[in-house]
UniProtKB/Swiss-Prot annotation:
Taxonomic path: Archaea, Methanobacteriati, Methanobacteriota, Stenosarchaea group, Methanomicrobia
Annotated organism of origin: Methanosarcina acetivorans (strain ATCC 35395 / DSM 2834 / JCM 12185 / C2A)
EC number: 2.3.1.169
Assembly information from the UniProt record: Monomer. The ACDS complex is made up of alpha, epsilon, beta, gamma and delta chains with a probable stoichiometry of (alpha(2)epsilon(2))(4)-beta(8)-(gamma(1)delta(1))(8) (Potential).
Name used for this protein in its record: Acetyl-CoA decarbonylase/synthase complex subunit beta 1
UniProt xrefs under InterPro entries: ACS_CODH_B_C, CO_DH/Ac-CoA_synth_bsu, CO_DH/Ac-CoA_synth_bsu_3_sf, CO_DH/Ac-CoA_synth_bsu_arc, Prismane-like_sf
Cofactor: [Ni-Fe-S] cluster
Reactions listed under catalytic activity: Co(I)-[corrinoid Fe-S protein] + acetyl-CoA + H(+) = methyl-Co(III)-[corrinoid Fe-S protein] + CO + CoA
Length: 469
């Protein structure tokens, strides 16, 4: 048996390589990171070959971040292009089996770290590549031959990235004419449960996986060739609500895979029992109550959203396999779904996108909304966002007037009720109690609004304040 300079075991899944224990970082938010699997004829593959283009591990400087691309070629009698993304998604699994090597995300968002301990035992990426290929061929026996090329040189990584994005785009377009109502089964994926134990990823024709790497066709291909693998069939069951995308079969699997933490998942709802979020999602949505709208921020965006929070902070709040009302992780291709958060207004509820994300998905944004959705070039805080939405006449602005009318009606009703209530006024004058003031200066312009709140007072005692002698 081949020996490797690090241990290999599923027990290392979920292992984090922290910054203080890191030798080098590959890809991630500070650089480029890519993984791609291509099906090739058997005679074009040199089995188990590892090629490194650019600096190898021993030539890298400790603590630095380097661009990174992994291109795997696979071959076999049963290998076909439909399996590429399925095999590609298992890269996350098998790399994390390697002690001291951390892998996060997918496709063009790959983020890896090699620990100091592991780097001290190997001076090249070659044994790492051989270990990953061994795991692939052991776990997925339909792969008969495999080779990999690692790129660490900036220009080469950029070149591979450009080619890969076209491949990803072609894959994603396959599901555009297929919808949830056209099929009898959906597919589930548990790949992210090593990092998010209660995550339940449901893939339907109208909802791509959170990582963006698995669509409905990919799930079908994976379940067919690897029935015991992380992608599996989900019987839809009965449709409970077409608008929210609630199915009995999805609810059953949600309860089972989350160990009872969740009993329902609504595929196309943002607020009511939303899809769980793992951490590998490409984009995170966030509710902005001040404008009653939803903003979205992608992983690559390094700035702040109008709520004063960046992607990494929101991702930490959203991920972990939880249902967090007000936050939602999605795959970018979900923007192209005709059922995109349809239970909560769809595109009419979207008020803010980073310009890089807006440009990327501009062809799916409804024509009448393209100039009404703000970017960081139009708005950097809540007040400027409000002004922009009012100026452009965004659909959410109409809800503000309705809310204000409702508040005014409630205030009038309260005034009438107070006026009608009998009150015994004391003979002597009295002073209403003053509101307690916050220490430390100005209150900061904080306004508290209670909506639909019922306050019951059992007894009110009004007493005359006596002067001290």
């Amino acid at each position: 048996m081949v020996e490797f300079p690090f241990e290999i075991s599923p027990m290392f899944e979920g292992e984090r390589v922290r910054k203080e224990g890191m030798f080098v970082e590959l890809g991630g938010p500070k650089s480029l990171g890519l993984e791609l699997v291509r099906a090739k004829p058997m005679d074009e593959i040199e089995d188990d070959k590892v090629t490194i283009v650019g600096p190898d591990l021993k030539e890298m400087e400790e603590g630095k971040t380097y661009p990174w691309a992994m291109i795997f070629n696979i071959g076999g009698e049963l290998v076909e292009p439909d399996l590429e993304s399925v095999v590609e998604r298992r890269v996350h699994d098998f790399i994390n089996y390697c002690q001291g090597i951390m892998h996060l995300n997918q496709r063009y968002d790959v983020w890896m770290r090699v620990s100091k301990d592991t780097a001290a035992k190997m001076d090249s990426f070659e044994p790492f590549g051989q270990a990953v290929m061994m795991l692939f061929k052991t776990e997925l026996p339909f792969i008969e031959k495999m080779q990999v090329t690692f790129y660490t040189e900036q220009a080469e990584v950029e070149k591979q990235m450009e080619t890969a994005k076209e491949i990803f785009k072609a894959r994603d377009e396959r599901t555009k004419d297929l919808h949830d109502e056209d099929v009898d089964v959906f597919y589930g994926c548990t790949l992210c449960q090593s990092f998010a134990p209660t995550n339940v990823c449901v893939v339907s024709p109208d909802r791509v996986s959170l990582c963006g790497a698995i669509n409905w066709f990919d799930g079908r291909a994976a379940a067919k060739v690897d029935p015991e693998g992380p992608q599996f069939e989900i019987a839809k069951g009965d449709l409970l609500d077409a608008n929210t995308g609630e199915y009995t079969g999805v609810n059953d699997i949600a309860k089972k895979l989350s160990a009872g933490e969740f009993d329902k998942i609504k595929l196309h709802s943002f607020f009511d029992s939303p899809h769980t979020s793992c951490g590998c999602f490409e984009v995170v949505g966030f509710y902005i109550p001040e404008v009653d709208g939803i903003g979205w921020v992608n992983r690559e965006y390094q700035g702040m959203a109008p709520n004063g929070i960046g992607f990494s902070t929101m991702a930490g709040q959203t991920g972990g396999g939880k249902q967090i009302v007000g936050f939602l992780g999605i795959g970018i291709n979900y923007f192209y779904s005709p059922k995109f958060i349809q239970a909560d207004g769809g595109w009419n509820r979207v008020v803010w996108l980073p310009s890089m994300l807006k440009d990327k998905i501009i062809d799916t944004i409804p024509e009448d909304l393209k100039d009404k959705i703000a970017t960081e070039n139009d708005s950097t805080d809540i007040e400027s966002l409000k002004a922009f939405l009012q100026e452009k006449g965004h659909p959410v602005v109409a809800t503000w007037a309705a809310e204000e009318e409702e508040e005014e009606e409630e205030e009038e009703e309260e005034e009438v009720a107070v006026a009608a209530a009998p009150m015994m006024m004391p003979a002597a004058g009295f002073q209403m109690p003053a509101m307690p003031m916050m220490s430390g200066g100005s209150s900061g312009g904080i306004k508290l609004t209670f909506k639909n709140a019922k306050i019951t007072i059992d007894k009110m005692i009004i007493s005359e304040k006596k002067e001290k002698k």
